[in-house]
Amino acid sequence: MRSIPEMMKINNIKTTYAVIGSRSVNANIDHILSERISKHDTIISGGAIGIDTMAAEWANANGISTIVIKPNYAVYGKKAPLIRNKEIALACDTMIAIWDGKSKGTLNAINHAKKAGKHVEIIRV
């Protein structure tokens, strides 16, 4: 049985993917993204160093629309990254989390997406 993202890709349904992950991860994510994301999709990035930046760079290199939602420290102070995580979770159709199993920020975003009923794919690295 195919996953929801696979079926959407096959049927050319536009999907908005949040691609998030641990800052400590320095993995090649090209194959992960190219297997899941089509030219007509959109990637949402949190703009953080690591997976967020790599995903945005991959999208730009492949002509895929990108939205970067950065934390608004001026308004929310030190809670800004957590509020940004919730905004990303609410804005996406599917979340791809490339996670080291330790990052609390990535876990926070995963939990927001699950609570919002979004499809979440966790790739442990």
What does each of the following model-derived ranges do?
Residues 1:
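Non-catalytic, low-structured ubiquitin/UBL-interacting segments
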Residues 4-125:
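Acidic/glycine-enriched connector segments
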